[in-house]
Regions:
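Repetitive helical segments and hydrophobic/amphipathic motifs
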Residues: 11-12
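Phosphoinositide-binding peripheral membrane targeting modules
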Residues: 86
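Positively charged n-region of N-terminal signal peptides that target proteins for export
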Residues: 1-4
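Lipid interaction determinants
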Residues: 6, 15-83, 96-148
Length: 148
C-alpha cells in the first residue's frame, strides 16, 4: 500500500512540475478586429521620408474576421464613399487581400488587379501595410490602430 501511495504521490509531483515548467509558445498577433487608419508614411530607399496626416473628416476603417475583410472610407473632399469586401490571409511577412467586390470605382480597378500584397508590420494594437514597387522597394504605408 505504501508503494502505491508513493507512486501516486510521485506521479502527482511529476505532472505538477511538468505543468509549471512547460512553456507554451507565444501567440501570434491577430488581424481579427476593427482597425482605423491613422495616417501614411512615404518611403525612399526603404526609409520613412514623410509622415502624411489624414485630412479633416477623412476616415477609413478595415474589419478583419474569419478570413474576410471589409473596408469603408469617407472623404469630405469626395462625394462618393468607397468600400470593398473580400478575403485575406497573412504570412510571416505579408498581408494578402483579395477584393471580390466594392463600389463602382473599386470595381473598375478590379478589372486590372484583384489581389493586393503588402508587407505587414503587425503589433498588438497597430499595424502597417506597406506597398512596394516592382523592384521590391517600399513606397508608402497605411498605418492603422485597433479600435476593437
Amino acid at each position: 500500500m505504501k508503494k502505491l501511495v508513493g507512486l501516486v504521490l510521485l506521479a502527482v509531483v511529476f505532472v505538477t512540475t511538468m505543468a509549471i515548467t512547460s512553456s507554451t509558445p507565444p501567440t501570434m498577433h491577430t488581424m481579427e478586429g476593427t482597425w482605423e487608419l491613422q495616417g501614411f508614411y512615404n518611403f525612399d530607399d526603404q526609409t520613412v521620408t514623410d509622415t502624411v496626416n489624414l485630412p479633416e473628416g477623412y476616415r477609413q476603417v478595415k474589419m478583419y474576421y474569419n478570413g474576410k475583410i471589409m473596408w469603408s472610407r469617407t472623404d469630405p473632399n469626395d462625394t462618393v464613399g468607397r468600400f470593398g469586401f473580400g478575403s485575406y490571409r497573412i504570412t510571416n511577412e505579408d498581408l494578402i487581400e483579395t477584393i471580390e467586390f466594392g463600389d463602382y470605382q473599386m470595381m473598375q480597378a478590379l478589372d486590372t488587379l484583384r489581389e493586393f500584397t503588402f508587407e505587414l508590420v503587425l503589433k498588438d494594437d497597430t499595424f502597417s501595410q506597406i506597398a512596394f514597387d516592382e523592384d521590391g522597394n517600399r513606397t508608402f504605408s497605411e498605418n492603422y490602430k485597433r479600435v476593437d
